[in-house]
Swiss-Prot record:
InterPro entries in the record: 26S_Proteasome_ATPase, AAA+_ATPase, AAA_lid_3, ATPase_AAA_core, ATPase_AAA_CS, NA-bd_OB-fold, P-loop_NTPase, Prot_ATP_ID_OB_2nd
Subunit field text: Component of the 19S regulatory particle (RP/PA700) base subcomplex of the 26S proteasome. The 26S proteasome is composed of a core protease (CP), known as the 20S proteasome, capped at one or both ends by the 19S regulatory particle (RP/PA700). The RP/PA700 complex is composed of at least 17 different subunits in two subcomplexes, the base and the lid, which form the portions proximal and distal to the 20S proteolytic core, respectively.
Name of the featured protein: 26S proteasome regulatory subunit 8 homolog A
Major localization listed first in the record, in broad terms: cytoplasm
Residues binding ATP: 202-209
């Protein structure tokens, strides 16, 4: 009888081999898992990259499509026949207006159905088709680019808190400028006309322009700033045209404030015999300004601020009530006002303890607000020159001596000067 084969290995050895086989299989499975995970991550990365490329290409396609549409519209406009430019004289009914076309004359024309009749008023610039003379487009007002530049786009950051020693002036300008713009019903209830213009006059450096900037900051309206010298032009009639367009722009962007600095350059008193064509042109500009201030169409949404340091040479026709309703004087600050101004300009400075600003204010008798600000700046420059990060009393004293230009001997010590 044949012997049956028996496994002669020990049970421990068989179990070890079985465990080794299972461990090898587990390692192989773990390796395959890591391989496929890396492969999945790589595919996901490629998918994200392809998605980003697709989004970028779609954005480029949309941009190119928009450019194509814009160019097609521009090409269509270029292929259209030209139009006549006219000015509306009178609205006649629901679909007809009387238009003046220079130099041909006046015509009664039809209005295109796409035009809103409520937007058409006298003096509106319009476009007429050259074949049928149908009004098909309302044009914006023609304003000189130089006049457009006078409109201040960014609201000034000056506030009333930055102005010292002018409490009475601030109160008066609020009554004339801010109150009519923010609460016009108060004037209507009293039955009085709103003030049109304000004249700020006083020595240079007393805060006239600074207060005008603060008014623009606190009133939510368009601020137009123009210097009187900008309205003096070389050719006859140019200055008058700029004044007209200035008020046209103010009416379009109402409520608005027109600030005319150095008004004495065009508003000086008229003489019987001028010295030349230059004076005559300046007088024409002033006459146009007077006409605009009177205004055949009085607007309560336009306020005029004027500033000058030579009120004595201004024409009396400009100063009469109805054109300039309030005149606000800006004198040099007194001792208390000088102290307030010094506190305002030095509150951001790194000062040493014990600085006596009241003593500085006492020594600057007759100084203007601009000179007080210059003293604070010069004191900081003296500290900077000594490589210090703080300002001392001596820095202020030297700054006062420099700004005020004391008539003293050069070798005189500062201690003797301030005794």
């Amino acid at each position: 009888m044949a012997a049956v084969g028996v496994d002669s290995r020990r049970p421990e050895t068989a179990m070890e081999e079985t465990c080794n086989v299972k461990g090898a299989a587990a390692k192989q499975g773990e390796g395959l898992k890591q391989y496929y995970l890396q492969h999945i991550h790589e595919l996901q990365r490629q998918l994200r990259q392809k998605t980003n490329n697709l989004n970028r290409l779609e954005a480029q396609r949309n941009e190119l499509n928009s450019r194509v549409r814009m160019l097609r519209e521009e090409l269509q406009l270029l292929q259209e026949p030209g139009s006549y430019v006219g000015e509306v004289v009178k609205v006649m009914g629901k679909n007809k207006v009387l238009v003046k076309v220079h130099p041909e004359g006046k015509y009664v024309v039809d209005i295109d159905k796409s035009i809103d009749i409520t937007k058409i008023t006298p003096s509106t610039r319009v476009a007429l088709r050259n074949d049928s003379y149908v009004l098909h487009l309302v044009l914006p007002s023609k304003v000189d680019p130089l006049v457009n530049l006078m409109k201040v786009e960014k609201v000034p950051d000056s506030t009333y808190d930055m102005i010292g020693g002018l409490d009475q002036q601030i109160k008066e300008i609020k009554e004339v400028i801010e109150l009519p713009i923010k609460h016009p019903e108060l004037f209507e209830s009293l039955g009085i006309a709103q003030p049109k213009g304000v004249l700020l006059y006083g020595p240079p450096g007393t805060g006239k322009t600074l207060l005008a900037r603060a008014v623009a900051h606190h009133t939510d309206c368009t601020f137009i700033r123009v210097s009187g010298s900008e309205l003096v032009q070389k050719y006859i009639g140019e200055g008058s045209r700029m004044v007209r367009e200035l008020f046209v722009m103010a009416r379009e962007h109402a409520p608005s404030i027109i600030f005319m600095d150095e008004i004495d350059s065009i508003g000086s008193a008229r003489m019987e015999s001028g010295s030349g064509n230059g004076d005559s042109e300046v007088q024409r500009t002033m006459l146009e300004l007077l006409n605009q201030l009177d205004g055949f169409e009085a607007s309560n949404k336009i306020k005029v601020l004027m500033a000058t340091n030579r009120i004595d040479i201004l024409d009396q026709a400009l100063l009469r009530p109805g054109r300039i309703d309030r005149k606000i004087e800006f004198p040099n600050p007194n001792e208390e006002s000088r102290f307030d101004i010094l506190k305002i300009h030095s509150r951001k400075m790194n000062l040493m303890r014990g600085i006596d600003l009241k003593k500085i204010a006492e020594k600057m008798n007759g100084a203007s607000g601009a000179e007080l600000k210059a003293v604070c700046t010069e004191a900081g420059m003296f500290a900077l020159r000594e490589r210090r990060v703080h300002v001392t009393q001596e820095d202020f004293e030297m700054a006062v001596a420099k700004v005020m230009k004391k008539d003293t001997e050069k070798n005189m010590s500062l201690r003797k000067l301030w005794k």
